Amino acid sequence: MHVRNRNVDTGMRFRSRNADTGIIILENKSRNKEYIESLREGERINEIYLCKVKQSALTKAGKPYDTLILQDKTGTLDAKIWEPGSVGIDEFDSLDYIAVMGDITSFQGNLQLNVKRVRKVQEGEYDPKDYLPVSDKDIDQMYEELKGLIASIKEVHLKKLLESFFVEDADFEKRFKFHSAAKTVHHGFVGGLLEHSLSVAKHCDYFAGCYPMLNRDLLITAAIFHDIGKLEELSTFPENDYTDDGQLLGHIIIGTEMVGDRIRTIPDFPKGLASELKHCILAHHGELEFGSPKKPALPEALALSFADNIDAKMETVREIFNNVPENNQEWQGYNRLLESNIRRSGKL
């Protein structure tokens, strides 16, 4: 295989400090970072990545090797260390930032990095923003827009409930702003939970204007709260993985409990209104087979399930097309969430 060395492009070089220890130093020079989405088969790379997963295994012949999942803000990359004990392979763990040198190959149609050298890097050698997927929208601006919707709520108990989370609780605000809405499916990035919740709430606001039978205050409140349980279902970045409660209970149950617990602290909160709000959260996936404990039995619950489905699927399409040139109209392959193959439409 022909390997094209990227040292010239990146200005980044490994050199051995001691031939016996195999300690390697990454020389920091002015360079452009090589993101995972830009990597191509046949290239040699010297780069820093977040090691999201590190697992040891054995080949069929009984030889030990390490399998890694490397991450930056553009995606993930499978990597293998075929000789873990060799010179130039330093000790590191999952969730460490590591400098790697290796060759990009292909396995079963997917890119894979064959790691030749690796070391754990120290703070100051990397910028965390390069390694975590982040919303391309302004997070503070989105949060202010969300608070604007909260300010528009007229029902005093619902407004108090919303404000107790989103206005009066600084720790909650910080968590909600930066949390992901999913592990992989859609909005799986820093700010994803906020972006998705705001978008769903805006869709619901539109629905309320189209259909006067809808209780706007109930619908908007349910939309803002519908995925609040993901704060406990998913761990924070860089892990962004399911917690024990996430596996055992799921975000729908967790979120309903979070809202129910806070409702009990608000004097004279109407019992019927509390039940309707919790029903909307419980039913927001729309169908039992999609994970909802209840099917929508209120028009607001039905509208919320539509809004959630619209935003999840349109974001999935956006993320698919985000990695495809604008003039590319090729079919992108079957997508599980969309239950369809998809391509860009033609331009007039």
Q: What function would you assign to each model-found segment?
A:
Residues 3, 8-10, 19-21:
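Short hydrophobic alpha-helical segments enriched in small aliphatic residues
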Residues 13-14:
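Intrinsically disordered, low-complexity segments enriched in serine/proline and basic residues
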Residues 24-45:
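OB-fold nucleic-acid-binding modules
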Residues 54-64, 77-78, 84-130:
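OB-fold single-stranded nucleic acid-binding module
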Residues 67-72, 236:
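Short, acidic/hydrophobic/Gly-rich beta-strand patch recurrent on exposed beta strands
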Residues 125-247:
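Acidic/His-rich, divalent-metal-binding segments that scaffold phosphate/diphosphate chemistry
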Residues 184-186, 195-196, 206-325:
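Divalent metal-dependent catalytic cores for phosphoryl transfer on phosphate-bearing substrates
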Residues 305, 329-348:
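N-terminal intrinsically disordered, cationic/polar leader segments
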